[in-house]
Amino acid sequence: DGVIAYSFEDSVYVQFTNGETVRIARGGNALSTLSFMTDGRLMALSGNKFIAIDLSNGTREELLSWEFSDEPKAVEPPKDYIAEQQQSLVEYIKLQRKNRQEKDDAQKALAKENSSVAPTPFYFDKSHRLAGISVSPAGNFAVVATTESKPTRDDSDIMPHYIQEDSRIAAKPVRQRVADAESVNHELWLLNLKTGEKSELKYFNLPGYNDDVLADVKAENAKAKGETYEVNRLPRDITLLQSWYWTKPSIRWHKNGNAVAVMLEAWDNKDRWIATVDLANKTLENQHRLHDDAWVNYRFNAFDWLNDSETLYYQSEHTGYSHLYVQKPGEKPVALTSGRFIVDDLTLSSDDNYIYFKANMEHPGLYEVYRADLS
């Protein structure tokens, strides 16, 4: 509606349609990942929580928070036979446990029904860390990716730096060698912010999720040794796609908050999937698979929703060239471009009539701006 929110240094500003600019935050817990919700409030990430800010009066509401720890329990089960007997035979112990459990149940019920109480945090494996999170503009769901928390480098990832003020040689930490990188997997979760339910989104619906993509090479190597290779059908490690063109997670909500798509990649870089989330059944639904026996490009991966229709638009190189497609979930994609050229830098018009893009139609080294007519 023309309202703009932005951050500068330690402050967050909102510019209204009348031209007035108001600072709504300065210092304290930094606000980032700014976006507008369907009800006009400003949503922001603050530490390990998302909040919603009412721009008319400045009030804030916590939408969700998360912790990587064991969920606190009002009562713990007995650890052995002696503890079991103690808890079942001693009336005082039984009463104390009963009271703690009832108090905990009442507090959780109050948090669900009373907006005066902050929602209960979502708890994840304490050995994991956050890999990505995105909240629906409607404030009713969130998609979260977590991964095992482990160091990405060690003391050997160093490089000599010769130019120093003291004329000595300094050892600088650098990225690890490619050969030292270990496989990474993301667990994907759907959070229902209204009910507090947490559901894992399994990858079983992704075609090829357990393909042994190097089976031919491994079989050839085994044959040379006089051995036989048995095809491996274990699930591959899969993550949110890490693009060279954006830093936010590869999770895209439609602006109405009722549809969400994710872009996933296999750790071996042979497959990329665009999938939507069935919010009712809590499952992933594959919409497009891009496979490359060599390597899926880190470019040409733009994807998003049209503004006024739950229709995806995206880039794909499955023909060998990066081209532009639109697709209603569950239907076949429609190619908007084709030929021996590449399409990049997509921009959707606000009225959904055009997608502007850059392409080298006339010559591989000559890029010009074009538009695809969606009307």
How should each PLM-predicted stretch be described?
Residues D1-S375:
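Beta-propeller folds
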